[in-house]
């Protein structure tokens, strides 16, 4: 984890872990990961952006090194994640920021930019997420995220990740290994499993309309860039077209060779995000 620091803060009564890159810079990028992932997914992008920005990469409640919620029905939802984001920024003294969010992390940014962080998020990058999700893709994600498997070896866990996250696009072997090592935990019986609270998928049953955010979208008054995986089953082409036509009228760029969601790990993806944030 060269180039960043590992930190913890209590936000809304819950301990939240985050990594910080480029600590000497005044301008801040918040980079927030996807549903069943961790902030370490942002390492490659954060290392690139840290040459000119301070980058904060949280682990969402119930993921990675952050605390698991004792009230999963109430707290695994966008409204509580938005509260966590506000608390995190307030405690870090961040008055304004640029926001990069993959999947769920983008949905949090969308909600916050139209809500509690209106005026504080200056620019928003949504990585394969919009104000509406395709239901078959949600069911696909729930099928593996809601009942995480356990394996005897790290090699088996890595093979599992390579299968379910194949839509991320190109990752070198070293990055697959890092993805595995930074998103695993060992069970009491010694087996390894993905590093998150399986109860976080209750969001889809306890808050079934959480990801339907057209009202928030139409209220946005900031520049938005949407990266859509060419083969994404979550962000459909018609949704992306509607995002171009209404609300903040997003710029939409299709990322070739990816589904849900681009891994944010290639020079092309670095350049797209950097140019947008620097504009």
How should each PLM-predicted stretch be described?
Residues 1-30, 51-53, 94-95, 122, ...:
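Alpha/beta-hydrolase fold catalytic core
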Residues 17-68:
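Conserved HGGG/HGGXW glycine-rich cap/lid loop of the alpha/beta-hydrolase fold
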Residues 44, 57-100, 272:
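Active-site loop/oxyanion-hole signature of alpha/beta-hydrolase fold enzymes
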Residues 95-135:
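Conserved hydrolase catalytic core segment
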Residues 129-156:
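A catalytic-pocket lid/entrance helix-loop region that shapes and gates access to the active site
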Residues 185-242, 254:
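Conserved serine/cysteine hydrolase catalytic core
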Residues 258-267:
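Catalytic histidine-centered segment of alpha/beta-hydrolase-like enzymes
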